[in-house]
UniProtKB/Swiss-Prot annotation:
The keyword Cytoplasm does not apply. The gene is crdA. InterPro entries: Flavoprotein-like_sf, FMN_Rdtase-like_dom, NAD(P)H-dep_reductase. Signal peptide: none annotated. Belongs to the NADH-dependent flavin reductase family. The lineage of its organism: Bacteria, Pseudomonadati, Pseudomonadota, Gammaproteobacteria, Vibrionales. Keywords: Electron transport, Flavoprotein, FMN, NAD, Transport. NADH:(hydroxy)cinnamate reductase Crd is a heterodimer composed of CrdA and CrdB subunits, encoded by adjacent genes. This is NADH:(hydroxy)cinnamate reductase subunit CrdA. GO terms for molecular function: azobenzene reductase activity; FMN binding. Component of the NADH:(hydroxy)cinnamate reductase. CrdA is probably reduced by NADH and then transfers the electrons to the catalytic center of CrdB. Is likely involved in protecting V.ruber from (hydroxy)cinnamate poisoning. Binds 1 FMN non-covalently per subunit. SUPFAM superfamilies: Flavoproteins.
Length: 202
């Protein structure tokens, strides 16, 4: 599996980036994770089709090429960061590349709740008609007190959180396979479906 792992912040130092970097190493035998930084994207504005920034087009292409997307979000004032909202607005307004794309949400925060409100906010956004991502149900990875969650080598310290992450990622790989199969079968059915006017003799 090939996943695009989006760092949902423009902060230079981020435990959400550390979380994705850890996942990239830890799950390398199961999947390839490409980290993507949204900090270089321009703030969203309504652009004409021929004026969409190249950075946005590049992000859309990477999303399309990936089997699924992982988004790591911090929590600012009970919500996702403005820079992540802006990136999603670009996708919604232009390519809609997240439509039917399997998505896993994870998050780290300095507080005890581990970005739970931001993750709920992000789910609501990704479920909007213009994005319409395929969100893995009943799954949250909440890494609270994240400043103390990693050792100097960037390894996750808490064995219980590591086991939880292992289980969630295993389920996400299976979820990705299921969605890919479902969409493939739906495409075949659409191709094979004939309407009355198509079968009517001339």
């Amino acid at each position: 599996m090939n996943y695009l792992a989006i760092v949902g912040t423009n902060s230079e130092v981020s435990t959400n980036r550390m979380l994705l970097q850890f996942m990239q190493r830890h799950f390398q035998a199961q999947a390839q994770l490409e980290l993507y930084e949204i900090r270089d994207l321009p703030a969203f504005y309504e652009a004409d089709d021929d004026q969409v920034p190249q950075e946005v087009t590049s992000l859309s292409d990477k999303i399309r090429q990936a089997d699924g997307v992982i988004i790591a979000t911090p929590e600012y004032d009970h919500a996702i960061p403005a820079v992540l909202k802006s990136a999603l607005e670009w996708i919604s307004y232009t390519s809609q590349a997240l439509t039917d794309k399997p998505v896993l949400i994870v998050g780290a925060s300095h507080g005890a709740l581990g970005s739970s409100r931001a993750q709920a906010h992000l789910r609501q956004i990704l479920d909007s008609p213009e994005l319409a991502a395929r969100l893995m149900p009943s799954s949250e990875f909440l890494l609270g007190k994240s400043q103390a969650a990693f050792n100097r080598s960037g390894q996750l310290i808490d064995e219980h959180k590591l086991a939880e992450l292992d289980e969630i990622f295993r389920e996400f790989v299976l979820f990705t396979e299921m969605i890919t199969k479902l969409l493939s079968e739906r495409t075949i059915i659409k191709k094979d479906k004939k309407y009355a006017w198509q079968t009517r003799e001339a």
